[in-house]
Amino acid sequence: MSALKKRKITEKQPETNSDSEAESVSSRGSAKDETQTSGEEPAPAKSFKELGIIDQLCEACENMGYKAPTPIQSQAIPLALEGRDVIGLAETGSGKTAAFALPMLQALMEAPQTLFGLVLAPTRELAYQISQAFETLGSTIGVRCAVIVGGMDMVAQSIALGKKPHIIVATPGRLLDHLENTKGFSLRNLKYLAIDEADRLLDMDFGESLDKIIRILPRTRHTYLFSATMSTKVESLQRASLSNPVRVSVSSKYQTVSTLQSSYICIPHKHKNLYLVYLLNEFAGQSAIIFTTTVHETQRVAFMLRALGFGAIPLHGQLSQSARLGALGKFRSRSRDILVATDVAARGLDIPSVDVVFNFDLPMDSKTYIHRVGRTARAGKSGVAISFVTQYDVEVWLRIEHALSKKLPEYQVEKDEVMVMSERVAEASRQATIEMKSFDEKKGARGKKFGKGKRSRDDMDQEEG
């Protein structure tokens, strides 16, 4: 082990053994999982070394700015290092990626092998971010990752797989395409599987692809499943994919973190634009995500804010993959400080320092509300979330408060101060309407070109919102 710490990974190629056949989906689910919650556990560990992480990876954690393990890391990592299958239930921004990446990398160092680990994620952006985390944490040991997602060239991906990476990070649809069609590609010797954002994977109808992948993977493996919630579908996936797992939890079903200041603002629907601009000026200089419910509204709000001089960029599922990654890159680097987004940005994206979340359009359910406001107040930092409640949203807002089991305070503003900007905002809205006409025409042309209907397997990891 000590020798491995001082050199890069020199791996053996996995042997191709036709006797290593895939299990059936139901064969691993006979044992019940144990349960332990954060309330039963001691305080989080003070260091990764205390959890059993080796010095080389501890140093990588320091380089990434991980000062101390988060609660989910403190609970999950020791169990994973013991060789247990783990189910991790934790809120967005709790450090789930490192909770499965560190044990996987440590095991890779102890027994170097190509095609060692597989991580399944629901969206293309999340897959790239997980891969980046693996490569950064494993940089001193020469870890190689391949990202296999829809919308990219199959041949180039086949070449990347042919180079035998240590870790594959993939969305289920495209991975299954390669397992079924790419000559010479096999995961029969895979040692580790991590399923991230499991509830989101199943919400996006990846269930059939997951079922097929799990049947193909070897029976003898370590599996980690991480999810924000434990739904009936996730329970079924757990029974199908994990063997005698232990469950760790640091959040309840509908819970926001204590460092989050959540409030609402009650306004007439016709003045939503005005109040948004007023609040953005109130929080000037801070990074913000503005959530909307439709692609059209995302683009319109972004156009309007740009006309007013704000550094706003849109993010939604109808942008090209390169445009989406470009938008995220600009927002992370703070060259743009306002992201206008559909719920494509509510889960799993690596945006570590969002100061404010605005629910410009209310989500229709409490679960989505939790995921949206989870973009701020992450990893112990404070954050603000303000929801716009118009005369049409009262019933939805009351349902959200009921699910949270608390009444949230109203954010107070002076109406006269808000109305000062009315003429400028009205003009910016008119400009946005003109730009939207051009946007809708282009979108219509794309629809005629490519046709409509049920999404293909290749497009399932690109959210429609």
Curated annotation (Swiss-Prot):
GO cellular component labels: nucleus
User: Which segment of this protein is annotated as the motif DEAD box?
Assistant: 196-199
Q: What is its EC number?
A: 3.6.4.13
Bias class Basic residues marks the residues at: 445-455
Molecular-function GO terms, alphabetical: ATP binding; ATP hydrolysis activity; RNA binding; RNA helicase activity
Q: Which keywords describe this protein according to UniProt?
A: ATP-binding, Helicase, Hydrolase, Nucleotide-binding, Nucleus, Ribosome biogenesis, RNA-binding, rRNA processing
Superkingdom, according to UniProt? Eukaryota
Q: Could you tell me which residue ranges the Helicase ATP-binding domain spans?
A: 77-248
The record lists its disulfide bonds as none
The first-level EC class reads: hydrolase
| Reactions catalysed | ATP + H2O = ADP + phosphate + H(+)
Its annotated compartments are:
Nucleus
Please verify whether the record's keywords include Transmembrane helix.
no
The UniProt subunit note reads as follows:
Interacts with the SSU processome.
What does the comment on domains in this protein's record state? The Q motif is unique to and characteristic of the DEAD box family of RNA helicases and controls ATP binding and hydrolysis.
Output this protein's name: ATP-dependent rRNA helicase rrp3
What is the species of this protein?
Answer: Emericella nidulans (strain FGSC A4 / ATCC 38163 / CBS 112.46 / NRRL 194 / M139)
